[in-house]
């Protein structure tokens, strides 16, 4: 503990009847919350407020905020609140409470994913000769980030599939001669860490696998960790948050050029700009 970053940590006992613990670096339990229902991820957003992602059956389906005493202050469940099925918006791994300066309120960034279609894969630069049947499960669980307001509206969305390129065939969509000339895009045909065991480039199930998301309030930038690319990427939230009333405009802006990656660090080989780091 003497050599660690000073502070506290929040381990979770996953599974039925899970409990979130707030502990100091010596392992002393400072406080604990019974998950509602069994939680899989929690963090201390502000004193006494604990955002949590929790599962519904076998899918991670909602997020909530509890106070210090465990009272539920806010809960978001997509099928009920926005009419989106759990299959199309399962949450996983991380949730970050942020201050949205344009809305002048707290909002929640949440990692989610959904299955994609062959048409979506083709439009993103995939090989059009691959059939939906041949894709099989390879188009399942591709990540995106949503921002949810306190009145349970999706006010912003950033999707990996909107920011892709390919250098395989100039007749396919989103062609670039060399991915290093498009550092703001993900090379669809770069073989991710998840693809290397079976040697299969292109889209694969759980293509990017985001483990964490964070927000820098000063710059208005979102930091995302797509694990299977061994990268950290930065995208501009505030530049693409263009309307406080018509949230579809924010989603469209985030899908466009202003939503491209503005900084990436970790694995230059993923956009043909250098060698893979030795610690991948």
Functional labels for PLM-detected ranges:
Residues 1-280:
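Histidine-/acidic-rich catalytic cores in large beta-rich domains
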């Amino acid at each position: 503990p003497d050599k660690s970053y000073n502070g506290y940590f929040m381990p979770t006992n996953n599974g039925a009847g899970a409990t979130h613990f707030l502990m100091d670096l010596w392992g002393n339990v400072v406080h604990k919350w019974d998950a509602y229902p069994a939680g899989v991820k929690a963090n201390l957003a502000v004193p006494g407020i604990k955002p949590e992602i929790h599962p519904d059956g076998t899918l991670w389906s909602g997020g909530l905020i509890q106070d210090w005493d465990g009272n539920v202050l806010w809960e978001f469940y997509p099928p009920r609140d926005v009419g989106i099925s759990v299959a199309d918006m399962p949450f996983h791994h991380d949730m970050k409470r942020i201050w949205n300066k344009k809305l002048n309120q707290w909002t929640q960034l949440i990692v989610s994913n959904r299955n994609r279609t062959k048409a979506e894969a083709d439009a993103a630069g995939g090989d059009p000769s691959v059939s939906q049947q041949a894709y099989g499960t390879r188009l399942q669980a591709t990540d995106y980030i949503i921002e949810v307001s306190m009145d349970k509206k999706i006010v912003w969305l950033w999707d990996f599939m909107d920011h892709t390129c390919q250098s395989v065939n100039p007749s396919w969509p989103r062609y670039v001669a060399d991915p290093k000339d498009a550092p703001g895009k993900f090379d669809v045909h770069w073989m991710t860490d998840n693809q290397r065991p079976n040697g299969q480039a292109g889209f694969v199930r759980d293509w990017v696998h985001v483990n964490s998301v964070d927000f820098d309030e000063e710059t208005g930038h979102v930091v995302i960790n797509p694990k299977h690319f061994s990268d950290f990427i930065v995208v501009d939230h505030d530049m693409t948050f263009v309307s406080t009333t018509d949230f579809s405009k924010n989603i469209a802006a985030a899908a466009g050029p202003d939503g491209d990656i503005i900084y990436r660090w970790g694995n230059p080989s993923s956009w043909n700009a250098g060698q893979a780091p030795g610690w991948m």
